[in-house]
Amino acid sequence: LDNNLPTLGTRMESTWAYMTELAASTKYFDYIEYEAEYAPYTEPDLENICRASELYGCATVIKVDRQNRYYNAQRAIACGASGILFADMYTAEEVKETIDAITTSYPGGGIFGRPNRRLGMNGTGRMRMSDYRKMTDDVVKMIMIEKVDAFKNLDAICKVPGVDMVVFGPFDYATNAGWEMDKNAKDLDEVHREMIRIALENGVQPCVQLDYNTNVQYFYDLGVRHF
């Protein structure tokens, strides 16, 4: 993100860290996304997933539920996650509150206290507070755009300080709009393209999750660099 370079990730629902290690060891992927919204897990599971990714210089993104997102996101960051993907957002106001929850409580910052876990391990036994601030600031904040209201509020959401990326969720969007995936495929494509356009106009990177690589060029031509 800092160097405007493309990224490629893959998704996991298994807590078996060996599966994460297999994916990361291919060197094909820049990040592994663990779907904590769907799969059961413990905090040691998240630590092991992050460790397995780190073995091969791979980042880890954790997707969290809406209801308990503050707690789960804070714990995921403490476990070593490089990014958090927040599901089921609706308004810019709640996005701001969500970003504040994982931003260190420095003057003018958020409400996140010192996460004394893997995040704070730098080999010295004592990390400067400014280092904690930088580490939490560097966590990639990603927002799912999968509700009709979120799409309507997209311009304002993209203007929330700290929002790095947005991701379209076609299945949830179709459900929320009262659509069907097959009958309203063109409508969903139109919303997706418009999401990409609005995000890029605001300097926020769209991330597109694909089941197949056949559409990569199409989205690349729209300005997407993260898959």
PLM feature segments, named:
Residues 1-60, 66-67, 162-163:
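Conserved N-terminal beta1-alpha1 strand-loop-helix module at the mouth
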Residues 1-11, 124-138, 193-194, 200-201:
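N-terminal amphipathic alpha-helix/helix-capping segment at the start of soluble metabolic enzymes
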Residues 71, 81-161, 175:
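Conserved anion-binding
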Residues 43-69, 102-109, 134-136, 184-207:
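Alpha-helix-loop-beta-strand connector modules within alpha/beta enzyme cores
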Residues 163, 168-189:
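Glycine/Thr-rich beta-alpha phosphate-binding loop at enzyme active sites
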Residues 5-9, 30-31, 57-61, 82-83, ...:
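Structural preference for beta-strand elements that scaffold enzyme active sites
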Residues 10, 35, 84, 98, ...:
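Conserved, mostly hydrophobic/aromatic
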Residues 20-25, 62, 67-82, 86, ...:
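Catalytic cores of alpha/beta
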